[in-house]
Regions:
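Phosphate- and other anionic-substrate recognition elements at nucleic-acid/protein interfaces
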Residues: 2-150
Length: 150
């Protein structure tokens, strides 16, 4: 038998976007709502602050260039992992993959934003990308669930 130490997994789920990114952290490996902490960025003043004990909204920082915007967004994620949850070790990071529904210039900005986050994360954490249909299937039972069902 081992020394009795149990290595608890810290599971990190990231739904990364330009306008409303969110991070969910389960500090004990559980999947119940009460086992998790939820963080999100918003531009709406009424959604900033502690909504529930484990749900906290942060305001987007001002930015002057796309790179500054992407750096702010990825920095916010790293702040959550490194500062708010620094005690939790053994972090397993999962990022929802691209949905491919965007068009035009947004496609490039979404890709650049995601690339910067993944680059910064992979320097310190093991990251895995999960395709949106798998996330939807786990959450609703249907891989093609719409936003309302999610």
């Amino acid at each position: 038998m081992s020394s009795g130490l149990i290595k608890t997994k810290t599971i990190v789920g990231i739904d990364y976007s330009l306008n409303s990114p969110a991070v969910c952290i389960s500090t004990n490996g559980g999947t119940a709502f009460s086992d998790c902490y939820f963080y999100y960025l918003t531009s709406k003043k009424k959604h900033i602050g502690k909504m529930l004990e484990n749900v906290i909204g942060y305001e987007h920082k001002e930015w002057k260039s796309p790179i500054e915007r992407f750096t702010n967004l990825s920095g916010w994620v790293l702040h959550i992992l490194d500062t708010l949850h620094k005690k939790q070790k053994n972090k397993h990071v999962f990022i929802e993959g691209y949905s491919y529904g965007s068009k035009g210039q947004a496609v490039f900005q979404i890709a650049e934003n995601g690339g910067i986050l993944k680059y910064r994360l992979q320097k310190r954490f093991t990251c895995k990308t999960i395709v949106p249909s798998v996330v939807k299937k786990l959450a609703t039972g249907k891989g093609n669930a719409d936003k309302q069902k999610m």
